[in-house]
Amino acid sequence: MTSSADLTNLKELLSLYKSLKFSDSAAIEKYNSLVEWGTSTYWKIGVQKVANVETSISDYYDEVKNKPFNIDPGYYIFLPVYFGSVFIYSKGKNMVELGSGNSFQIPDDMRSACNKVLDSDNGIDFLRFVLLNNRWIMEDAISKYQSPVNIFKLASEYGLNIPKYLEIEIEEDTLFDDELYSIIERSFDDKFPKISISYIKLGELRRQVVDFFKFSFMYIESIKVDRIGDNIFIPSVITKSGKKILVKDVDHLIRSKVREHTFVKVKKKNTFSILYDYDGNGTETRGEVIKRIIDTIGRDYYVNGKYFSKVGSAGLKQLTNKLDINECATVDELVDEINKSGTVKRKIKNQSAFDLSRECLGYPEADFITLVNNMRFKIENCKVVNFNIENTNCLNNPSIETIYGNFNQFVSIFNIVTDVKKRLFE
C-alpha cells in the first residue's frame, strides 16, 4: 500500500516532470533523485532520468558567485535579480512557475504584451518574470540575437514593468567586492527588493550571478499579514526586535515551517532579511504545518492562491454570483433580493446549506466530503462557530489542501445561507 510520504514524492515527481524544460540544475537534480527513488520503490514509473533538457535556465546562468572576484575589461549589462516567485513565459505562451511547473493565470493585456514581445524576435527563448506582493516585473529576456535591453524597451512600450539596468564599460581588471556590489545595487532605484545581481558581457549569452550575503538565525515573535491590494494580504514574519523578514507567499511560509517563538534561518542582505527558501527543520508534515499556520493567522482569513484574503463580505458576493442575483451588502438585502425571485427562493429551500455553499465555491464533491469526514465541528444555532481537522494526512491531496486553506470562506458562506434559510422559511 502506498504511504502518504510516497504520495508526496510521486506528486512532486510529476510536477517536476511537467516543468523540466523550465527547470534549473537544482530542480533537475531533485527530479533525477526522485526518479531513482521511484524506480527502486515501484520498479517502473514511466519516466526516466535526464542528463540534458532542451530549455534549462541553467544553460543561461553560471553558478552563483558569493565571494569577491576579478571581473575582466569589457562592456557589461548589469541587471537586478529580484526577490519573489520566478516565472517563465516562453513560446508555449503560458506563464509557468519555475520549479513547481504550475501554470499561472495572468491578465489578458499582460498575456497580449508578452506574446507581442515573443513574436518580435524568433530568437527569444523565454522571458523571465518575478511576482511579489501581487505585482509583476520582467527580470530578464533571453534571446540568441539581441541584448535584453532592446527587449526591455519594447516590453515597456507594450506596458510591461521592466527592470532597471546598468550599461557600463570596465576598462581594466577590477575587483568585484562588496563595495562595487553595493554601488551597482543602489543604481537600481526601483522599489522591488533585490537578492542578487546578474551581468552579461557584450557578445556573450550566459549570465553571471553575484550574491553576497550572510546566513543568520532570527527569533520569530509573530506571524501576521500585510495588505498589498484589494482584499489581498501577504504573510509577514516579525522578529523579536520588530523587524520584518521578507516572505514570497503562503507556500514559502509553509515550506519553511515557520513557527512563532522559534528561530528561523534567514539570508541577510544590506537592508533586509529573507526567509531562507528551504524545507524547514522539524518533523511536521506539510498538512500539520498548514493547519498550524491557518490557526495562527486566524479564522478571519483564507488562502487565496499565493496570498491570504479576508472573509469579510467576500462570501456575500460569491453567493449572489452563484444565485445570479444583484449584489448585496448585508444579509437583510440578500433576503429581500431572494424574495423577488420564486426560482431562487425554491432553490434556497430545496438545497441544503452544505451543498449550496460547496457549489458556490466550486469544490469537488468527493474531495470536500473526504475533508469534512476528517474534521470536527462545533455547531450553535445551526451555525458553525468552530472547526478542527483531526487527521491532516488527507491534506496530502493537493485539491483537499486547497479546500482546507479556503475553509474559513466556506464557513462564512454556510453561516450566511443558514441565516437566510431561517429568515425565509421559519
Swiss-Prot record:
The keyword Repressor does not apply. InterPro entries: Chordopox_A20R. Disulfide bonds: none annotated. GO terms for biological process: DNA replication. It comes from the Viruses. Keywords: DNA replication, Phosphoprotein. Interacts with the DNA polymerase catalytic subunit OPG071. Interacts with UDG/OPG116. Component of the uracil-DNA glycosylase(UDG)-OPG148-polymerase complex; OPG148 and UDG form a heterodimeric processivity factor that associates with OPG071 to form the processive polymerase holoenzyme. Interacts with OPG117. Plays an essential role in viral DNA replication by acting as the polymerase processivity factor together with protein OPG116. Serves as a bridge which links the DNA polymerase OPG071 and the uracil DNA glycosylase. Belongs to the orthopoxvirus OPG148 family. This is DNA polymerase processivity factor component OPG148. It comes from Vaccinia virus (strain Western Reserve).
